[in-house]
Amino acid sequence: MDDFSATHINYTLSIHLSGIFFAWHRHFVWLWERTLREECGYNGYQPYWDWALSANNISASPIFDGSPTSLSGNGDPINQEPFLQLEPTNITIPTGTGGGCVTNGPFANMTLNLPDLSMAGDEEFPSNAFDYKPHCFTRNLNSHMSSAFTSQADVDRLLNSPSITDLQANIDFSAWPELREARILGPHAAAHMSLGRTMDDFWTAPQDPSFMLHHAQVDRIWSLWQARGPESRRWALNGTSTINNRPTSPEVTLDTELVWGSLSESKTMREVMSTEAYHFCYEYGA
């Protein structure tokens, strides 16, 4: 897990709010599945978290209910402000119901080795990004967040996006007018925030075991969207390879090189645009 989390940290300012977001994470999840098979003896496939199924009560999801077959549940309750402000707007929603260390399920009392970078922002690479800072795995499950922003209606809005530019905007920015104007809280971010704490760390979220299920769902949505118009959508690209195009960088093309550090050899965008070409051989159910 540390190798994957460190890789995510290293490329955070390239792989979010950019033209390589979908493609980079597609191969990242595939690498995780391969690693589970080659190093851990896993014989199954990479599951995805269908956000809509748990949107109304995330704590009851078999993924997050704290049972022996879950990915652990909520963190222990801690004192928190009762409402969360969705900055930079004045909109508030109730906060989560946990917030502390996870002490239930298979990942109870798990120690994370990389630092908490949740306050680092997205302007500069944090100088302490790879410091050894052991701390507990935390969650703050929030059904108010999930029901408002990761429902089936939100998934349908993504799948009905008319272009790759619209799909990118719809997954990153909410449909709520004030939030969309602020360019925040699309289903991708909202799912992170509905789990909270470790998963809500922009840089180190892969330290939450559910990260790969979440991004398999992101990949599933992209794949299903592509399948609705494969002739035009399989190769559809938009954007650059830097977050919010900071600093300014060239538009991505099918020849743009993607890198994952020591986890993988580099790939071109062309090699990761389809789940059924080059080194990929999988598909998602509708």
UniProtKB/Swiss-Prot annotation:
Applied biotechnology uses: Hancockiamide D displays potent cytotoxic activity against murine myeloma NS-1 cells, suggesting a potential antitumour application. More interestingly, hancockiamide C, the likely end metabolite of the hkm pathway, shows potent Arabidopsis thaliana seed anti-germination activity, but is inactive against the monocot Eragrostis tef seed, suggesting that it could be a herbicidal lead targeting monocots. The herbicidal activity of hancockiamide C could be due to its phenylpropanoid-like structural features, which may act on the plant lignan pathways, and hence warrants further investigations.
Domain of life: Eukaryota
EC number(s) per entry: 1.14.-.-
One Pfam entry name: Tyrosinase
UniProt entry tagged with the keyword Calcium: no
Binding site for Cu cation A: H16, H25
Cofactor note: Binds 2 copper ions per subunit.
Cofactor(s), names only, from the UniProt record: Cu(2+)
Keyword flag Oxidoreductase: yes
Coiled-coil stretches: none
UniProt xrefs under SUPFAM superfamilies: Di-copper centre-containing domain
Keywords of the record: Copper, Metal-binding, Monooxygenase, Oxidoreductase
GO molecular function, one term: monooxygenase activity
Binding-site residues for Cu cation B, renumbered to this chain: H215
Annotated metabolic or biological route of this protein: Secondary metabolite biosynthesis
PROSITE patterns, per database record: TYROSINASE_1, TYROSINASE_2
Protein role: Oxidase; part of the gene cluster that mediates the biosynthesis of hancockiamides, an unusual new family of N-cinnamoylated piperazines. The NRPS hkm10 and the NmrA-like reductase hkm9 are proposed to convert two molecules of L-Phe to the intermediary piperazine called xenocockiamide A. Xenocockiamide A is then converted to hancockiamide D via a series of hydroxylations and O-methylations.
Family recorded in the similarity comment: Belongs to the tyrosinase family.
The protein's name in its UniProt record: Oxidase hkm6
Species for this entry: Aspergillus hancockii
